[in-house]
Amino acid sequence: MKTVLIALLRFYKVAVSPMLGDRCRFYPSCSDYAREAIQYHGAARGTYLAVRRVCRCHPFSAGGIDLVPPPNSDIRARGEADARSHRL
């Protein structure tokens, strides 16, 4: 399942993203974050983290540096407060 999700992200990055332009307010971009989250945390938790990240990426968000939490970390300790404290 990880392989399929990463392949879909790669397709998005190559085929769809260039048409939309750079819109992500975070570093790394949401697609890179999703790929990394799935690689480190597996398909289920990685997808959950990626969806949370995409929900935070909107025009009213300040953005900033938002890295994938390390494996076995408590993701509730992270979130928007962490993203706000690491603005680019």
UniProtKB/Swiss-Prot annotation:
Sorted keywords for this record are: Cell inner membrane, Cell membrane, Membrane
Cell membrane recorded as keyword: yes
Source domain of life: Bacteria
Chief site of localization: membrane
What does the entry list under GO cellular component?
plasma membrane
| Protein's cellular compartments | Cell inner membrane
The UniProt entry lists membrane topology as: Peripheral membrane protein
This chain's function reads: Could be involved in insertion of integral membrane proteins into the membrane.
Q: Which family does it belong to?
A: Belongs to the UPF0161 family.
- Identify the HAMAP family for this entry: UPF0161_YidD (MF_00386)
State the NCBIfam families in the record.
membrane protein insertion efficiency factor YidD
What is the designated name of this protein?
Answer: Putative membrane protein insertion efficiency factor
The uppermost taxa in this organism's lineage are: Bacteria, Pseudomonadati, Pseudomonadota, Betaproteobacteria, Burkholderiales
